[in-house]
Amino acid sequence: MKIYRVAKASEYLVITGIFIKDIKLKKKAWIFPGQSCTVLDLSPVNYTFEVQAMSAEKLPFVLPAVFTIGPRVDDQESLLKYAKLISPHDRHSNHVNELVQGIIEGETRVLAASMTMEEVFRGTKQFKQEVFDKVQLELNQFGLLIYNANVKQLVDVPGHEYFSYLGQKTQMEAKNQARVDVSEAKMKGEIGSKLREGQTLQNAAKIDAETKVIAMQRAGEGEKEGIKVRTEVKVFENQREAEVAQANSELAKKKAAWTKAAQVAEVEAKKAVALREAELQGEVERMNALTTTEKLKADLLSKASVQYETKVQEANWELYKKQKETEAILYEKKAEAEAQKASADATFYASKQAAEAELYAKKKEAEGIVTLGQAQGAYVSTLLNALGNDYTAVRDYLMINGDMFQEIAKINAEAIRGLEPKISIWTNGGDNSGGITDGAMGMKEVAGVYKMLPPLFKTVHEQTGMLPPAWMGALSEKSS
């Protein structure tokens, strides 16, 4: 039965099982049969350690530290690593605690061994940052992130009071420095008091002198300002008088222009009246001439129009006739072209159908040959399996089943039909039953071979008509 699970704000659901290739992280999901669901808490955890390390001078010390470590929630790959490697264990278990402690102690000891005690003590911030960086690099393999790291004050190891002695040294140096500072402060106070008195008298005299100078400067500046004001007033009066004169001059110019414009307008009005009278008189005369012209044009154009219309009608008829003839020829050519096209299409279609039919027949014939070959192959394979893979037996069976021996006999019979062979049998006529020695027996065999030659030559001559060479002998006339 499937179950619907929902994780809290600081949790994830780790789902494994069927339909899931590796693992799946979800905030909410259906859990089907065959799947396993584990809740993954993302809250960071505080780990408190007291790391015992040794500096480059072989001085041991204790470094108390508190690390706040948790899974990296902003990286999906880191969450998958954490879910695979850390989630099976409780976050507060010894396994996780020892893992984190081992990484922190190892990196802290390695780093402390490369620094002197003075460098560790005075560069606590830098030392803390380097430890932070190196530990974070190792925790990345497990998908963990250091959210905060607090390194407390370095502590002495019992029996090695380095920091205690260093503190006493610092206290004595501070005490001596304080005494020196008090003496220097008293000396500076007395010197400063005398210096302030002298500076007060000097400043008073300086201020008196500067006051007199400033008073004289102020008096001169007042006189200069008075002269400047009077000059500016005179300049302003002159400017106003010039502006008044300029305004009077412009007014006189405008009056003259206005008078001239009035006179010109009066003359233009008179001329305009005369021009208008002349225009009207010309218009009357033009209208009279136009009337006369239109009358003559009407008389002359009436005849020309009739002739023009007649010619136009004749030309249009000729044009229409030629267009129709051209259209008829074009239609005939078009019909002929369409007929040729239809004939070509029919021929092409017939050729195409014949080619397709031939292709189909060839294809079916090839398929039949392939099918027959496959059947014969299966038949031969079955025979071979039935006869125990004996190729000789299969060959003999196929030759018998295919009447091969009958065909061979028939062919041989046809080949010797009509022949009359003569069969001769001969022997040397001797044996070794008479007690002949081995040497005599060998000569007897040679003699037997010579006795066999005449009957052999005779048989060859009878069957083939060929005679032996002269050096081997000749047949008797009786035999020939």
Swiss-Prot record:
Domain of life: Eukaryota
Entry coiled-coil feature ranges: 237-257
GO biological process, alphabetically ordered: nodulation
UniProt keyword list: Cell membrane, Coiled coil, Lipoprotein, Membrane, Nodulation, Palmitate
Homology family: Belongs to the band 7/mec-2 family. Flotillin subfamily.
Residues with lipid group (S-palmitoyl cysteine): 37
Recorded name of the encoding gene: FLOT2
Gene Ontology CC annotation, any one: plasma membrane
Induction: Up-regulated during nodulation.
Cellular location(s): Cell membrane; Membrane, Caveola
Description of post-translational modifications: May be palmitoylated.
Organism annotation: Medicago truncatula (Barrel medic)
Protein name listed in UniProt: Flotillin-like protein 2
Transmembrane segments: none
Tissue note: Expressed in flowers in green pods. Primarily expressed in vascular tissues. Upon induction of nodulation, expansion of expression in the root cortex in the region of elongating root hairs, which will eventually become colonized by bacteria. Expressed in the infection zone in nodules.
